[in-house]
Amino acid sequence: MLLSVFIILINTLFVLAIPPKEGSDNNPSKKYLVTDLPGLYENVKPKISVPLMFSGQLELYPENNTHYFFWKFVDSELNQDTSKKTIFWLNGGPGCSSMDGALLETGPFRIDENEKVIYNNGSWHKFGDIIYVDQPAGTGFSFTNEYITDLDQVAWYFLKFMEEYYKLFPNEINNEIYFAGESYAGQYIPYIADAILKRNKNLKENDVKYDLKGILIGNGWVSPNQQSLSYLPFFINHGLIDKSHPRWGSLLSKHEKCQKIVNKIDGHFDEADVHPYEVNSATCESILTDLLNYSQDRESDSDHRCINMYDYTLRDSYPSCGMNWPFELKYVAPFLRKEEVMHDLNLVDLKYWRECSGKVGRMFGARNSLPAVHLLPNISQEIPIILFNGANDIICNSDGVLSYLDKLQWGGKVGFTNKDDQINWIYDNKEVGYILMERNISFINIYNSSHMVPYDLPDVSRALMDLVSGKYEEKEKDGKREFITYPLGEVRNKLGQEIPADESSKPIEDKPDDKPIEDKPEETKPEQTKPEDETSSSTSEIIPTSEASFIPEPEESTSSKFTRLIQLGVIFIIFWGVYILYVSYRARPSSIIKKPARSTNSSGRKKNVQWADQLNRFEEDENELGSPPPQGIIAKTISKITGNTSNRGRYAPAGDGSREFTDDIELGEGISDPNVDEFIIGSDDDEDDDEDVETHEGNPKKTESKS
């Protein structure tokens, strides 16, 4: 018994002598660290290409059980240019997961046919830390008991997310901030940006100003009714339907009804009141539904009958009309539904992932919020706005974006004063698009790309961040202005040598030229750049300085080593003293040792056996990613001795472990592959687990979703 107590005491001293894992108490972000994914170390090479990752479901409001899921990627290569920049990426819907952005567009990974990650050479995390957020709550892996219904609430909730996020990553709070996203994020992002700018002007005590530098909206759904007027001209101009069609009269009639609604909106545009005819876009949006129906090629096979609404050069089955695209979506969905992956992503509440949530879309009526187009003029007075568009998209096409800009007043003028003043965008010696730019708003039309520009042209899309941050060259060729950007690796060398520091740090700005753009070039695809080879034989990961506080240093300082030696010396002396006492105790004459009656088994040994059995209850490990729960000194000792050997991320399924997945219904119709979710339009039925939820405004009408 006495010996057991001494052994426990010695082990306890060993535990106390070893410094606690750095960040276990002061760095709560450690429990969100992602250490593995299927295919990560098999397919992503060299090792330096593996990004530092954090993900999990971050609690915002415990009173209504609202948690936002985020997935953050940090460049593992030490890079001064990327270490002070943060990009928040949002997909649309409403109710479509930003995992589309992470795994199909701007993130470092794509998913292959084996449902494993492979590397994306065009990842935006090479420009700055990028965080993908599933929002509003109920989208993707986010969850809540109370769904939100309006755009103002989107902004409030996201500011709360940022507040909680910076508690996890306080070293990043002074970073430059960019927001980027696509489609219905054209509503989200302006509202969030506007809320941040207002917050910065009304800081409370101890608040830190958010350094918002710019927003980028790809194929954005910003002015719904106005943009819907572009559908019929688009189909005519691209030869997708002609005026001799038997249903032409019906199409023209609906177009005229939409035009009357838009005229009414224009007449009251400057009013602060929210008018029902402006926030209800059902009539105008139905034009596209009819066009897709009437333009079917009924002689084609069933899989190629309908025009793909996201890329008019592609075909799909009807009525999917693009909802089965991108084809890799059939790999993404089962990948995110794997228990192994949910384990790796640190989910604390298991949720069956779906690309788009019909429930979120139905609850999110946005009936009390003006369309985001109203916010652009004020935002542009403070930060640059980039509106980029894939030229092949129908649903949020370039003509629709230009049509609302033509009417918009910003910077004291209406629209672009000279639409012929187009700037050629050159990337990797190829003309990839053109730019219109005035008064802090830029429109960029990108050739040979769809609704999801980063999916088609990942390298080109990353160069958008070079445009918004001013990392480009400006030249003139044949009387036309050109903005020149470079592939990763070339940009710093070329710009560092040829552009003065003060020029390369400026965002794109207005410069005079009145020459028209030439005809669109032939289709070109930029070559993807390869990740740089490893320059060191060391197998240790390189961690960005912004995350250094989470990772133990490879070598301790001399003073730390000296302290360890003193501690170990003290422990050795104590151990030696205990040993001498024990030997003296055993060496005493047996005649003077009183032996109490007892069973054959030693009580002390029996306790040791019992403690060993209890070790199965402890999950603590010195390599555990999350902060350990409170423990007594004996429990710490036992945990230190035995420890858990799992090398995966924290995984704590809710409930008793028997909980079933939460299920949603697929959006839309006509999807032949059960693994493929609808990409955007329509939510016809409730999810299988449709439960009563609280909303802030009764039962809003069902709305189309734009991803």
Swiss-Prot record:
Keywords: Apoptosis, Carboxypeptidase, Glycoprotein, Golgi apparatus, Hydrolase, Membrane, Protease, Signal, Transmembrane, Transmembrane helix
Described purpose of this protein according to its UniProt entry: Protease with a carboxypeptidase B-like function involved in the C-terminal processing of the lysine and arginine residues from protein precursors. Promotes cell fusion and is involved in the programmed cell death.
Sugar-bearing residue positions: 64, 121, 293, 378, 440, 448
Ranges of compositional bias, category Acidic residues: 683-694
Organism: Candida tropicalis (strain ATCC MYA-3404 / T1)
Active site per the UniProt annotation: 183, 393, 451
E.C. code: 3.4.16.6
Protein name as annotated: Pheromone-processing carboxypeptidase KEX1
Family membership noted in the UniProt record: Belongs to the peptidase S10 family.
